Amino acid sequence: MSDPSEGSLTPGELLVDDAPVELNAGRETATVTVENTGDRPVQVGSHYHFFETNPALAFDRETAYGMRLNIPAGTAVRFEPGAERDVELVAIGGDRIVHGMDGLVNGDLDDEATRERAMDRAAAAGYRGVER
């Protein structure tokens, strides 16, 4: 790391404390077992609402609602066809309003009517791991 007093900063460089940075401190977490039942690999990015991931991924979507992968920003997890693995999820922060993704939620994650509508949409669309 450059010493800012020496005037040798690199554009875009981050100056951080020497102490380790704890990611997602104090946020709710959950672990789900995910199986890729499809015939192609599926890659999921760090900030994607995990509930809305590819319908071929089989896991407890009820548990995953309102959560994302607990991995550093800008990274992803790849699920190979037929493979099963455990992943840790973390609660989405901020205002907890989700739009886009696969269009299942489009609203406030903490609103019970929005949650029920999202579960119904996922079940109707054939997402694996939704019990309805």
From Swiss-Prot:
It is an enzyme of class 3 (hydrolase). It catalyses: urea + 2 H2O + H(+) = hydrogencarbonate + 2 NH4(+). NCBIfam families: PRK13203.1 (NF009682), urease_beta (TIGR00192). GO terms for cellular component: urease complex. Heterotrimer of UreA (gamma), UreB (beta) and UreC (alpha) subunits. Three heterotrimers associate to form the active enzyme. This is Urease subunit beta. CDD domains: Urease_beta. One of its GO terms (molecular function) is urease activity. The keyword Cytoplasm applies. Pfam families: Urease_beta. Its EC number is 3.5.1.5. It is found in: Cytoplasm.
